């Protein structure tokens, strides 16, 4: 379908070739360019398709011969009529509207254009509603008549289709030669021109001349000129005139066309001053919107700088005794009025001010509606008319509160305060909403000090916070009461008392109070704090360590020892096993208190009350001496004698005996065996050298005398059940004395001689000869077919970097190194007995005779040692490679150690097992996961292996040297069959947007 485009601004020197060149790439049929020319440089171009026309319109504003052109959608009828009008002008018909025939042709042209527009698919501005709008409201029926009048009925004309940037001077130029008395531009609700205007002429003769300018151009626009009315002029802010004024002006001779219309307008003003029918003062009114609540008349005068404005011309609008964001301003002159309208959407105190024209009638209605409510409220404010209901309504009318939604359900008041960081909010001004079960709804109510602050806070609507888009709504206190919350009723004294009791940690007040929690936390949050306080009391161990709130002191019974919960004080004073049990913890404290403090402190209270000091003296002195007698005699003396004599006789000598000699026999050797780690960190580090000196007799006797016989002889009151109850102390203290003393003699002396001398000779001689000469015949004997497969994987593994032990190194190197260290590590670190004793990897290199005889010949192997299974005795698997140890133990980080800090591949000295090695179905089998998303975490990997028996702590995500994820991870299955099943089922399954690859390590 052919589409016609109208072009304006074509230069005089341009031709059809230039137009076609401008529309390069678009299809213009032959004969599709029609140049009209003229002052506006008009042309019509026909395009073959709608798409070409759409793309052509997008080139509006381009340049043809250094001249900017504008493009508009047109029709064939408009093009034909324009061409006909151009031809008639060439014949000499003159300008349209200069005669009757011109008017007839113009009217016929309009009718034809209307018919063509109704038939074509493109709408025209003529067949649209001719009613014009201001502030979104239509007024009157202004459709053009089918038969245009030759003379104007009144001096008012209505213009449609004006450019949006037009001003009054442009209108006067458009009606050049006519006396224009005034122009009112109609605007949208946002203050922009809508393309319509009302023009008032000095007389009906001038208005009739203006009607002849219908469908003339103003810039690049067709302007429609229609008859207006005085009612429209007054309704949109114009001033009415007397009936005689128009007659008087019509009788006057119109000035020549060349006379300045402004001079004529001034002279006409002096002869016939304008007066309104209502005899109200003259003025132009504007409606100001979106004003800041803090501005005053002075700010508006500065805003409308350059205008003649006083405080009496400014009127702020009030509603319910509260000032709104609306105001009205009256200007005395049209110039000031136009200056004010040009400031539309100008920012005043951080708010864009909307300036709309308004008629006096509408302004009075506006003010009357508000003033009526205000006067009623003033009457109720008089004495005798004040009621409680009205006071509540007046307060609730102020929107001081904000209802917040879409917070996280566990939001706290501190987080709400962070959201409103620019406002000073107390916790009492925030109320969190919970459901009937005490679970947070993610909603809150916040009260501000003034309505202005609340309105500023409402600007944070849809601000993202804590991962969600927070929604805000300004509400009044009456609406807040619908939530069951009344901020005004909350007693500040009660909240202050609650806050003070909360700071003191008064638990009785927290649990006995029946009042609803109306302060910083909701009901459920308050209950959560109570539970935390209870947990802290139940888990109390020591006031300096585990009690988190230092201002809450436990009773005196809790301060003596960390084990007061388990044993009564009587058991502590009489049981020697109790002395032995806290020796690891309390042995350090008495030593620091006794040897670093002044010695007088020990005699200020009787030894029965302080049960720590008698223990130390019980350790220092032999059992034959009764150490309580001198103390009882000392306490009977006066304090002065006690202080003067005791330090010289009793205190300076016993410490020399007890601390310098007896501790060497009693304290220091048993802790060397039982508590190997604490003495290194504890006191007396310079004396650590004495631990190794004591003779073996003292090493064995003190434990038998002090630890084993004393409970039976002197301390028979303590029950034996207390020692068996706590498993930690049962295994930490008694078992080390029973098990650790014999093993040093048993393992430190015989094993080095037994394992370092005979086993190396036994293992060094046979294996080199056995592996260098007979291994091929010895291991190729059983299945020949099974041996032919491994060489392929054997060579594959040698190409990989992670296999650090090729067969050449395994069989040609001396195997002594493999058997030197495991025996030492076996007895020095008992945690690795199952792996590093002569175990799987070591026995693979031995002949079958050695594998079967070694466990029988060595009775001192650990109890949990088991000979290797049949899988490792099979010759093909043993011949393939030396399988180093892969530590699947739990390191400090809680993850399995698959490499150095879980970064990259396995370290040197280890290798990743071959998936096809017959390593047994009962062994832990690692799987490597590749092509993982970089953001995948451990939980997603565990979910991926849901249903398979995976070791949870074995998941290890691999990282590169920069600490970034490589998209690979390693997991461990409990056996080989489970790993193969997972690889078979889960390979190429998606984890997020990626399909992962699974391989055995």
From Swiss-Prot:
<feature type="modified residue" description="Phosphoserine">
    <location>
        <position position="575"/>
    </location>
</feature>
<feature type="cross-link" description="Glycyl lysine isopeptide (Lys-Gly) (interchain with G-Cter in SUMO2)">
    <location>
        <position position="151"/>
    </location>
</feature>
<feature type="compositionally biased region" description="Basic and acidic residues">
    <location>
        <begin position="247"/>
        <end position="262"/>
    </location>
</feature>
<feature type="domain" description="RRM 2">
    <location>
        <begin position="284"/>
        <end position="360"/>
    </location>
</feature>
<feature type="modified residue" description="Phosphoserine">
    <location>
        <position position="638"/>
    </location>
</feature>
<dbReference type="InterPro" id="IPR000504">
    <property type="entry name" value="RRM_dom"/>
</dbReference>
<dbReference type="GO" id="GO:0043484">
    <property type="term" value="P:regulation of RNA splicing"/>
</dbReference>
<feature type="modified residue" description="Phosphoserine">
    <location>
        <position position="254"/>
    </location>
</feature>
<dbReference type="Pfam" id="PF00076">
    <property type="entry name" value="RRM_1"/>
</dbReference>
<feature type="cross-link" description="Glycyl lysine isopeptide (Lys-Gly) (interchain with G-Cter in SUMO2)">
    <location>
        <position position="541"/>
    </location>
</feature>
<dbReference type="GO" id="GO:0005654">
    <property type="term" value="C:nucleoplasm"/>
</dbReference>
<feature type="cross-link" description="Glycyl lysine isopeptide (Lys-Gly) (interchain with G-Cter in SUMO2)">
    <location>
        <position position="114"/>
    </location>
</feature>
<feature type="modified residue" description="Phosphoserine">
    <location>
        <position position="710"/>
    </location>
</feature>
<feature type="compositionally biased region" description="Basic residues">
    <location>
        <begin position="263"/>
        <end position="278"/>
    </location>
</feature>
<feature type="modified residue" description="Phosphoserine">
    <location>
        <position position="591"/>
    </location>
</feature>
<feature type="modified residue" description="Phosphoserine">
    <location>
        <position position="292"/>
    </location>
</feature>
<feature type="compositionally biased region" description="Basic and acidic residues">
    <location>
        <begin position="631"/>
        <end position="881"/>
    </location>
</feature>
<feature type="cross-link" description="Glycyl lysine isopeptide (Lys-Gly) (interchain with G-Cter in SUMO2)">
    <location>
        <position position="895"/>
    </location>
</feature>
<feature type="modified residue" description="Phosphoserine">
    <location>
        <position position="278"/>
    </location>
</feature>
<feature type="cross-link" description="Glycyl lysine isopeptide (Lys-Gly) (interchain with G-Cter in SUMO2)">
    <location>
        <position position="514"/>
    </location>
</feature>
<feature type="modified residue" description="Phosphoserine">
    <location>
        <position position="377"/>
    </location>
</feature>
<protein>
    <recommendedName>
        <fullName>RNA-binding protein 12B</fullName>
    </recommendedName>
</protein>
<feature type="modified residue" description="Phosphoserine">
    <location>
        <position position="280"/>
    </location>
</feature>
<feature type="modified residue" description="Phosphoserine">
    <location>
        <position position="718"/>
    </location>
</feature>
<dbReference type="InterPro" id="IPR035979">
    <property type="entry name" value="RBD_domain_sf"/>
</dbReference>
<feature type="cross-link" description="Glycyl lysine isopeptide (Lys-Gly) (interchain with G-Cter in SUMO2)">
    <location>
        <position position="335"/>
    </location>
</feature>
<feature type="modified residue" description="N6-acetyllysine">
    <location>
        <position position="319"/>
    </location>
</feature>
<keyword id="KW-0007">Acetylation</keyword>
<dbReference type="InterPro" id="IPR012677">
    <property type="entry name" value="Nucleotide-bd_a/b_plait_sf"/>
</dbReference>
<dbReference type="GO" id="GO:0003723">
    <property type="term" value="F:RNA binding"/>
</dbReference>
<keyword id="KW-0597">Phosphoprotein</keyword>
<keyword id="KW-0832">Ubl conjugation</keyword>
<feature type="compositionally biased region" description="Polar residues">
    <location>
        <begin position="119"/>
        <end position="128"/>
    </location>
</feature>
<feature type="domain" description="RRM 3">
    <location>
        <begin position="400"/>
        <end position="477"/>
    </location>
</feature>
<feature type="modified residue" description="Phosphoserine">
    <location>
        <position position="98"/>
    </location>
</feature>
<dbReference type="InterPro" id="IPR034858">
    <property type="entry name" value="RBM12B_RRM3"/>
</dbReference>
<feature type="modified residue" description="Phosphothreonine">
    <location>
        <position position="276"/>
    </location>
</feature>
<feature type="modified residue" description="Phosphoserine">
    <location>
        <position position="101"/>
    </location>
</feature>
<dbReference type="InterPro" id="IPR050666">
    <property type="entry name" value="ESRP"/>
</dbReference>
<feature type="domain" description="RRM 4">
    <location>
        <begin position="925"/>
        <end position="1001"/>
    </location>
</feature>
<feature type="domain" description="RRM 1">
    <location>
        <begin position="155"/>
        <end position="230"/>
    </location>
</feature>
<feature type="region of interest" description="Disordered">
    <location>
        <begin position="544"/>
        <end position="587"/>
    </location>
</feature>
């Amino acid at each position: 379908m052919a589409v016609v485009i109208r072009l304006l601004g074509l230069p005089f020197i341009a031709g059809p070739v230039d137009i076609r060149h401008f529309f390069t790439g678009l299809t213009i049929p032959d004969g599709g360019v029609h140049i009209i020319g003229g002052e506006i440089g008009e042309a019509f171009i026909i395009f073959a398709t709608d798409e070409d026309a759409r793309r052509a319109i997008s080139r509006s504003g381009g340049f043809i011969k250094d001249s900017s052109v504008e493009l508009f959608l047109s029709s064939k009828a408009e093009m034909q009529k324009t061409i006909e009008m151009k031809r008639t002008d060439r014949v000499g018909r003159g300008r349209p509207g200069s005669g009757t025939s011109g008017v007839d042709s113009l009217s016929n042209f309009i009718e034809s254009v209307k018919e063509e527009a109704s038939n074509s698919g493109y709408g025209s501005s003529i067949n649209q509603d001719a009613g014009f709008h201001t502030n979104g409201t239509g007024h009157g029926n202004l459709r053009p008549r089918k038969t245009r009048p030759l003379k104007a009925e009144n001096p008012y004309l209505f213009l449609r289709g004006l450019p949006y940037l037009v001003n009054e001077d442009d209108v006067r130029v458009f009606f050049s030669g006519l006396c224009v008395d005034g122009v009112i531009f109609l605007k949208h609700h946002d203050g922009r021109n809508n393309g319509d205007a009302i023009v008032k002429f000095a007389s009906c003769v001038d208005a009739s001349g203006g009607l002849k300018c219908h469908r003339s151009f103003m810039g690049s626009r067709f302007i429609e000129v229609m008859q207006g009315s005085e009612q429209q002029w007054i309704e949109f802010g114009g001033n009415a005139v007397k009936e005689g004024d128009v007659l008087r002006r019509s009788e006057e001779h119109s000035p020549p066309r060349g006379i300045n219309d402004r001079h004529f307008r001034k002279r006409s003003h002096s002869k016939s001053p304008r007066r309104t029918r209502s005899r109200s003062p003259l003025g132009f009114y504007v409606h100001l919107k979106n004003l800041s609540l803090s501005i005053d008349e002075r700010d508006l005068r500065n805003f409308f700088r350059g205008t003649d404005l006083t405080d009496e011309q400014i009127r702020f609008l009030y509603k319910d005794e509260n000032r709104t964001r609306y105001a009205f301003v009256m200007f005395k002159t049209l110039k000031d009025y136009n200056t004010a309208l040009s400031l539309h959407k100008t920012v005043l105190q951080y708010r864009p001010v909307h300036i709309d024209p308004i008629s006096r009638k509408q302004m009075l209605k506006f003010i009357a509606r508000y003033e009526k409510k205000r006067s009623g409220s003033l009457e109720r404010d008089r004495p005798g008319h004040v009621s409680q209901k009205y006071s509540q309504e007046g307060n609730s009318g102020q929107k001081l509160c904000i209802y917040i939604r879409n917070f996280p359900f566990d939001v706290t008041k501190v987080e709400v305060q962070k959201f409103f960081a620019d406002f000073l909010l107390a916790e009492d001004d925030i109320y969190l909403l919970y459901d009937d079960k005490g679970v947070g709804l993610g909603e809150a109510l916040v009260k501000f000090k003034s309505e202005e602050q609340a309105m500023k806070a409402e600007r944070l609507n849809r601000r993202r916070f804590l991962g969600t888009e927070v929604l805000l709504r300004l509400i009044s206190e009456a609406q807040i009461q619908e939530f069951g919350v009344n901020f005004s009723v909350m007693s500040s004294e009660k909240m202050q008392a609650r806050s003070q009791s909360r700071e003191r940690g008064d638990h009785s007040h927290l649990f006995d109070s029946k009042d609803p929690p109306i302060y910083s936390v909701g009901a459920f949050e308050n209950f959560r704090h109570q539970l935390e306080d209870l947990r802290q009391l139940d888990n109390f161990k020591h006031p300096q360590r585990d009690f988190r709130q230092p201002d809450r002191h436990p009773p005196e019974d809790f301060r003596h020892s960390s084990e007061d919960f388990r044993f009564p004080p009587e058991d502590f004073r009489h049981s020697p096993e109790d002395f032995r049990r806290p020796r690891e913890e309390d042995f350090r404290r008495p030593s620091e208190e006794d040897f670093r403090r002044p010695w007088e402190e020990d005699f200020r209270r009787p030894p029965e009350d302080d049960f720590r000091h008698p223990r130390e003296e019980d350790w220092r002195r032999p059992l034959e001496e009764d150490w309580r007698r001198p103390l009882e005699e000392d306490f009977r003396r006066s304090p002065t004698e006690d202080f003067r004599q005791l330090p010289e006789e009793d205190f300076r000598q016993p410490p020399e005996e007890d601390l310098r000699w007896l501790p060497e026999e009693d304290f220091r050797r048993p802790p060397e065996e039982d508590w190997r780690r604490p003495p290194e960190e504890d006191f007396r580090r310079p004396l650590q050298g004495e631990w190794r000196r004591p003779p073996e007799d003292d090493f064995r006797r003190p434990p038998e005398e002090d630890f084993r016989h004393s409970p039976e002889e002197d301390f028979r009151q303590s029950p034996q059940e207390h020692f068996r109850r706590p498993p930690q102390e049962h295994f930490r203290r008694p078992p080390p004395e029973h098990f650790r003393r014999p093993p040093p003699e048993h393992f430190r002396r015989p094993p080095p001689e037994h394992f370092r001398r005979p086993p190396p000779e036994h293992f060094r001689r046979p294996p080199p000869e056995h592996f260098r000469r007979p291994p091929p015949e010895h291991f190729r004997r059983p299945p020949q077919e099974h041996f032919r497969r491994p060489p392929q994987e054997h060579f594959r593994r040698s190409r990989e970097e992670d296999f650090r032990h090729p067969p050449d190194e395994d069989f040609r190197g001396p195997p002594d190194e493999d058997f030197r260290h495991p025996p030492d590590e076996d007895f020095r670190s008992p945690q690795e007995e199952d792996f590093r004793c002569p175990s799987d990897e070591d026995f693979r290199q031995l002949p079958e005779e050695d594998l079967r005889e070694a466990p029988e010949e060595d009775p001192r192997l650990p109890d949990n040692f088991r000979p290797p299974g049949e899988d490792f005795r099979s010759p093909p698997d043993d011949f393939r490679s030396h399988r180093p140890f892969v530590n699947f133990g739990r390191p400090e980080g809680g993850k399995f150690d698959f490499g150095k800090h879980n970064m990259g591949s396995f370290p040197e000295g280890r290798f990743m097992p071959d998936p096809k090695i017959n390593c047994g179905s009962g062994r832990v089998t690692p799987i490597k996961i590749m092509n993982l998303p970089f953001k995948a975490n451990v939980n997603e990997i565990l979910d991926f292996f849901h249903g398979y028996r995976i070791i949870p702590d074995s998941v290890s995500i691999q990282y590169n040297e920069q600490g970034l994820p490589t998209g690979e991870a390693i997991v461990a299955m409990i056996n080989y069959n489970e790993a193969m099943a997972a690889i078979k089922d889960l390979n190429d399954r998606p984890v997020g947007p990626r399909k992962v690859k699974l391989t055995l390590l």
